[in-house]
């Protein structure tokens, strides 16, 4: 992971690098491992949230990005889809802000991405990763077109990300925390 930051493969150096960074964080913290899972992300199910929490130092504001993953239908014995029993079965995944290193903060990258996307798409429930504009420069107000990133490009980006060891370490750590909570 450190190598990707140092080689400027992660960051905000270009529209493609920003997309790569978002996909990296979505893989690392949301545990998305396939192109299909990434294609389920949308501007309406990935949202910025802030809430107040009590800490040893008192009240503090915690900012995060939350992803409300689609519920997986379980098949009943008769082969039909069972209904969701409880609302809390819908997985809610989170990426918290990185106050220790704001230059690697998932929330800041998400906010920057939104600012570079066409406003008309920010309420869409069928797209998240957009194709970069062909002729944009860093100072351009928009970096992305209204065209969704195609599957083959997503798969290519994802294959590079899945080669990073820390992706699996973070996902294992988060899974272990969830198991401890049960």
Q: Which residues does each PLM region occupy?
A:
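Extended, non-catalytic subsegments within catalytic or DNA/protein-binding/adaptor domains
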Residues: 1-182
